[in-house]
From Swiss-Prot:
UniProt organism field: Lepilemur edwardsi
Record note on quaternary structure: Interacts with KDM5B.
InterPro entries with a match to the protein in the record: Homeodomain-like_sf, PAIRED_DNA-bd_dom, Paired_dom, PAX_fam, WH-like_DNA-bd_sf
Disulfide-bond pairs as recorded: none
Keywords, alphabetical: Developmental protein, DNA-binding, Nucleus, Paired box, Transcription, Transcription regulation
Annotated protein name in UniProt: Paired box protein Pax-9
Major site of localization recorded for this protein: nucleus
Chain's role: Transcription factor required for normal development of thymus, parathyroid glands, ultimobranchial bodies, teeth, skeletal elements of skull and larynx as well as distal limbs.
Residue span of region Interaction with KDM5B: 168-189
Gene Ontology CC: one annotated term: nucleus
Location(s) in or outside the cell: Nucleus
Amino acid sequence: MEPAFGEVNQLGGVFVNGRPLPNAIRLRIVELAQLGIRPCDISRQLRVSHGCVSKILARYNETGSILPGAIGGSKPRVTTPTVVKHIRTYKQRDPGIFAWEIRDRLLADGVCDKYNVPSVSSISRILRNKIGNLAQQGHYDSYKQHQPAPQPALPYNHIYSYPSPITAAAAKVPTPPGVPAIPGSVAMPRTWPSSHSVTDILGIRSITDQVSDSSPYHSPKVEEWSSLGRNNFPAAAPHAVNGLEKGALEQEAKYGQAPNGLPAVSSFVSASSMAPYPTPAQVSPYMTYSAAPSGYVAGHGWQHAGGTPLSPHNCDIPASLAFKGMQAAREGSHSVTASAL
């Protein structure tokens, strides 16, 4: 006769899937095991699967109870405030301690037993979430206590002000002799724009204002740059040219140039003072053709009606230019007349 509910296992026993084994069968399994019967023989005798028998016996050996565990319930909380306090104490005593070492200490000190001791992953999570933030806060507080008070920042602008590392670097750079030293507060300050004008956005106005206020030298503003000229600069000393000694310049100009074969600049003659070369006889490029007149082409189709062969567009050719070496080339060449052609 088939049961009204449940399923039949391979041994012929009846079980309900998802439900624990009845307590009577559990007690019988434990009694047979105490009599020395092997789990496989208990499985065949009670028609219960071998895995179920082994699990029940293992739970009884660990907890001493034959009752099943909570189905669908949560595990009891093992990370109690007492456990967290002891974990924090272990971590403060030895910052390099591992999670598994903390677990062993909890068992050794009797804080937890083997049933409610937190796992290694739980201890790591406690160290990361609960104790890690407190440790970082403690380090930060101790750092603030040992940290000296910050120096007041120089106000570079009336709205925003913050320290600039460039001023400290500029203060370390030595100033060469003869050059006026620029105050450290003026050396490349970082400024926030106080308005939407171009000079304030670029920081030009603030730099020039600070230079004019702190430096004894006059620094013109952007509006005055267009009015500056060469007359505004002080004249150099008569014995110095651009800050250099005149005697040194004359000596360098006197002995610094090596003599070469080129004539001096003053020996060249301008082209206007030279007489133009005689104009050679113009030879027509169109030769006499002995064929019928119909085959003779008087000129090109693109030639201007009033133009000449040398100036087809009726343009005047300027006088010949004076070039060096043209006379020698002209004397060495023989003129060719039209009759020879």
